[in-house]
Amino acid sequence: MTKVVAPVERVVFELNGERQEVAAADVEPSTTLLEFIRTRTPFRGPKLGCGEGGCGACVILIAKYNPKTDEVTEFNVNSCLTLLYSIHFCSIITTEGLGNTKDGFHSIQKRMSGFHASQCGFCTPGMCMSIFSSLVNADKSKKPAPPKGFSKLSISEAERSFSGNMCRCTGYRPIVDACKSFESDVDLEDLGLNIFWKKGDKHPDPTKLPSYTLGGGICTFPDFLKSEIKSSLDFNDASISGPREGWYCPKSIKQYYKLVNSGLFSESSVKVVVGNTSTGVYKDQDLYDKYIDIAGIPELSAIVRKDKGIEIGAATSISRTIEILNQESELTSSPNGSVVFRKLAEHMSKVASPFVRNTASIGGNIILAHKYPFRSDIATILLGAAATVNLQVSSKTLHVNLEQFLEQPPLDHSTLLLSIFIPHWASDCKKEHTLVFETYRAAPRPLGNAVSYVNSAFLGHVSLDKSSGDNILSNLHLAFGAYGTKHAIRARKVEEYLTGKILSASVVLEAIRLLRETIVPVEGTTHPEYRVSVAVGFLFSFLSPLCKGVIESGKTLSISEDLVDTDNVHNKPLSSRRETLSDDEYTPVGDPIKKYKVEVQASGEAIYVDDIPAPKNCLYGEFIYSTQPLANVKSIKFKPSLASKKIITVVSAKDIPTGGRNIGSTFWFGDEEPLFGDPIAEFAGQVLGVVIAETQPYADMAAKQAVVEYTTDGLKAPILTVEQAVQSNSYFQVPPERAPKQVGDFSNGMAEADHKIMSEEVKLSSQYYFYMETQTALAIPDEDNTMTVYSSSQFSELAQNVISKCLGIPFNNVRVITRRAGGGFGGKVVRSLHVRI
């Protein structure tokens, strides 16, 4: 094979002040930074929560150095998505690098403790790193210097600093207070209960707060790594490769096509990456042994300002794109020219979370929207702004509008998305016209960190009809997405109908009727009526201020610069709260005191089950779940894949020791649930077997390769709803000793009631427990047929009982240890037992 690039045999970076050098042959390219930190270093601060960039438990700070400008850039990222090979010559800081029991705790960690901002503590290290990143970047800004001991961070920035971090315990208020305490203009009296001063003090003393050094007080990029970068001949090398796998870093488009056309990937799976954040949305279905990292191609990160707009490289991060759009909005003198960029930036700041936006590329988001039915906000709002894309197809460069691109069939590696061009529309808007542009989104969390139920973007030119004084729309772009469609679309019929018409109530109603014909969710879309109604509401919100007869009686809206620069009512307000305090009758009972070991939780040194160092030759397991309700399991096979080769064995009901039982859990009512669905899977999601592999990622991926064959011969139809259970007379029998006792006479009480509900129906759906720490257990066999199980459990005695029954050993031969749990809320009582066993 022709040599394409010179290989580099190592990955060099700094971790909490220490130089790390990893031989490429020792670490596979699919290894994430989180996996490396937790399995190859003593640091356990970053936690594995959701594993998809949605919870923030794994957040760390990355610093990059540019030797050409001698500048250091710091930003926080999800270490669960960041691939280890992508941080070559970077500096990494985890919460242990901020402070610890040996070197002393950082003021962030101390204030998290003092403001009672931690309960289970599993999310706390990630919270600390998000706050630290915000402080570092705020202190580097050109804002006036704050008083000693404070940061340049504003209150709104403080609230947004951990907008992507989840906490199930605290309700966020104490975390917000801890972060706000760094802000120089904060009213200390408004901060919540803390140990630094008594609630009600009229003049709290800020010097009692743990001292803070401007800039965070931590060196984010060491001099030794700067020197190594400057002197290293590897800095511009194009690949990192080992004997089995490869990580390729082309430094030009030409090098990229040399790699693609080299035949190197003809018999292996290859993945093209920039930030690898797509795996948080669409999970990899198999392992990859070769990666092409295109983030280092300069052309893909170039920013080109043109007469009619701006061209942004496809590998530019979403965070960087927001900065650029805001800068362009400020530089553009015309209100018509600034509105598009400003509104786009505002909307993009609500996409994903800050640490996802820091690494996710704008081009990658559009590629996802093209390849999958991804509910992309960015694709929709760029479609509304009439953006175009530039593609490289082998030796040809193509320019197509975004709508055409989204409708194309999936691309192969021979096609490269180069850039996105966004027009500012200033020069296209006549003097007598005013440009209007608005974007909308409806989501479970409308201000970010959740995909949309519906999103839209509307652009148009508004002019006045001289005879009537009414508004007329032209050059309309009405884009809708995420409502249950493969990709974002333009409502062409509505655009054509509205163009040139004088806006009135009847015109708006007809436009809504046409929109309902256009917005048709595909079959299987959840809540289709809701999505359509939201889309209609967005269009109405856009048109109604422009239309007489829809706005309040007696008011008219003239076209002016005010129309262009209206405040976005969807912008995030500063949060508010209300505290109810008890009196001092029983003091000191109820006085705020510091919770035990919060600093240790904040520094990442508190040990949860998955933080326990794995014993030598430790194996890992992942469940194979039933995908069918009430079906006979005939066989379990595995697809031929890279992941399937990692399987050591599969444990099932036949592997239960002699004398043991197929028992997975037991209930207070006396019923038992089997550990494995054998020979019948009683419900979808029941465990059928456990894949065993050398690492947890191997086991997780291998379990996805399982192909289960079912048959329903001789079985009745499954009962899937409460209504079906009632109809089938299938009731859960509560033992008499467990049944609730009747208090009073129900019949007499109803007869004497002043108000009666004669008939009503109430439905309660299921709800996630949403504990941050996932179900985890570590089992270590010991002498004399005993077993020690470290478990994140809320009922260790029950776990001990069920494990002994399953293994067929005496109760006292099982030792279950629970040091702490990263949340539970009832979800780690019975449902955790399968994992323990």
Curated annotation (Swiss-Prot):
Start and end of every FAD-binding PCMH-type domain?
A: 240-427
GO MF terms held by the record: 2 iron, 2 sulfur cluster binding; aldehyde oxidase activity; FAD binding; iron ion binding; oxidoreductase activity
What's its EC?
1.2.3.1
Q: What class of enzyme is it?
A: oxidoreductase
> What does the note accompanying the cofactor annotation read?
Binds 2 [2Fe-2S] clusters.
Name the catalysed reactions.
Answer: an aldehyde + O2 + H2O = a carboxylate + H2O2 + H(+)
The protein depicted here goes by the name Probable aldehyde oxidase 4
Q: Which organism is it from?
A: Oryza sativa subsp. japonica (Rice)
Q: How the protein assembles, per its UniProt entry?
A: Aldehyde oxidases (AO) are homodimers and heterodimers of AO subunits.
Q: What is stated as this protein's family in its record?
A: Belongs to the xanthine dehydrogenase family.
Q: Which PROSITE patterns match?
A: 2FE2S_FER_1, 2FE2S_FER_2, FAD_PCMH
The answer to whether the entry has keyword Iron-sulfur is yes
Q: Name one GO biological process term.
A: abscisic acid biosynthetic process
Q: Which domain of life is it from?
A: Eukaryota
**Binding-site residues, [2Fe-2S] cluster:** C50, C55, C58, C80
Please tell me whether the keyword Metal-binding is annotated for this protein. Answer: yes
Q: Which SUPFAM superfamilies match?
A: 2Fe-2S ferredoxin-like, CO dehydrogenase flavoprotein C-terminal domain-like, CO dehydrogenase ISP C-domain like, CO dehydrogenase molybdoprotein N-domain-like, FAD-binding/transporter-associated domain-like, Molybdenum cofactor-binding domain
Record PANTHER family:
ALDEHYDE OXIDASE-LIKE PROTEIN-RELATED, XANTHINE DEHYDROGENASE
Q: Which UniProt keywords apply?
A: 2Fe-2S, Abscisic acid biosynthesis, Auxin biosynthesis, FAD, Flavoprotein, Iron, Iron-sulfur, Metal-binding, Molybdenum, NAD, Oxidoreductase
Cofactor(s) annotated in UniProt: [2Fe-2S] cluster; FAD; Mo-molybdopterin
- Which residue numbers delimit the 2Fe-2S ferredoxin-type domain? 9-98
